[in-house]
Design a protein with these regions (language model features):
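N-terminal pre-catalytic segment of deacetylase/amide-hydrolase enzymes
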Residues: 2-99, 131, 262-263, 269-288
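Active-site beta->alpha N-cap acidic-glycine motif
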Residues: 47, 51-144, 148-159, 173-186
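Structural recognition of the beta-strand scaffold that forms the well-ordered cores
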Residues: 77-80, 115-119, 141-144, 188-192, ...
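Acidic-and-aromatic substrate-binding clefts and catalytic sites of carbohydrate-active enzymes
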Residues: 87, 94-96, 119-128, 191-198, ...
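Generic structural signal for well-ordered alpha-helices
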Residues: 101, 105, 131-132, 168-175, ...
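Accessory recognition modules or surfaces
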Residues: 135-141, 169, 225-227, 234-247, ...
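His/Asp/Glu-enriched short active-site or ligand-binding loop at hydrolase and phosphoryl-transfer sites
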Residues: 197, 201-237, 272-283
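Catalytic grooves of carbohydrate-active enzymes
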Residues: 239-278
Length: 288
């Protein structure tokens, strides 16, 4: 659950935003999977793919933090969705509470909007088929939102606090849950639960090789019931290179799907192109 930004200063490598970004609004982005018929050949060919772009480590080797891409004329924006479920919410799911939002995913597909979903491992355990479907759709990419959705700092919106010696293992456990669900290519991107991090948590994850992904636009969709207000807050905040944080949990963000029906056409009308976080990181000087 994300309510506001809480972070320390972190160094992010940024570069010129330009032709590295592919056309958006369709699965024809550079990291989409394209499969066609292979013409007959007399020699064997081997398909290779580049690893996802990541930022270089921060000062003293700390986990790098990405917030937004350079402000250029490219007018790109990445919509991100946190698939929240904490480790102790299984009983609530069993009682009928919905932590997924298939209609939101369907709306993104209908409008052909690429997006990055930051998923908890517990969510993938609860909804393995949906996790796999999202991971297999070339419109989307899956980032890590921890397994437990416990806080990586003290005093983070009432979330239970995780000890430093468990942090890296919790992130690795989430990736294991994704693989168990059938997600083959989860990205090396991590979003801290609650958006809360400090030197200690950045140090704890430094060996994991992830890039921490924050945001510069808060949608305010958590527990919101006014879709128009959510849409307006996003539209007021988006600039070129923005990362928008939203949620795809029906119980905790019931207005988000409806808000998207306003946000998507309006941003396109303003000349924005939707991209995934990986594309913004690549444009910001991310290394492969």
């Amino acid at each position: 659950m994300i309510l506001s930004v809480r972070s320390i200063a972190a160094t992010c490598a940024v570069g010129a935003l330009g032709a590295a970004l592919a056309a958006c609004g369709s699965p024809a982005s550079p990291d989409a999977a394209h499969r066609g018929h292979r013409a007959p050949a007399t020699t064997a060919t081997i398909a290779t793919t580049s690893p996802p772009p990541t930022l270089a480590p921060g000062p003293a080797g700390l986990t790098p933090v990405f917030k937004n891409a350079p402000r250029t004329r490219a007018k790109t924006v990445a919509l991100t969705f946190d698939a929240d479920m904490t480790a102790d919410q299984g009983a609530r799911a069993a009682a009928g509470e919905h932590f997924d939002n298939p209609q939101l995913i369907a709306t993104l597909q209908k409008f052909k909007v690429p997006a990055t979903v930051f998923m908890t491992g517990r969510w993938a355990d609860e909804y393995p088929r949906e996790a796999k479907d999202i991971g297999q759709d070339p419109l989307f990419e899956i980032g890590n939102h921890s397994y437990s959705h416990y806080a990586f700092t003290d005093d983070c919106y009432g979330l239970p606090t995780m000890s430093e010696d468990r942090m890296r293992a919790d992130v690795e456990r989430a990736y294991a849950a994704f693989r168990q669900a059938g997600v083959r290519d989860a990205m090396p991107y991590f979003r801290f639960p609650g958006g809360c991090y400090d030197q200690r948590s950045l140090r704890a994850l430094s060996a994991s090789g992830v890039t921490a992904v924050q945001w510069d636009v808060v949608s305010g969709d958590a527990f919101a019931t006014d879709a128009d207000a959510v849409a307006q807050q996003v539209l007021d905040g988006v600039r070129s290179g923005s990362v928008v944080v939203m949620h795809c949990t029906r119980s905790a963000a019931p207005a988000t799907e409806q808000a998207l029906r306003t946000i998507i056409p309006e941003l396109r009308h303003r000349g924005f192109r939707f991209v995934k976080v990986s594309q913004l990181i690549a444009a910001a000087g991310g290394r492969h």
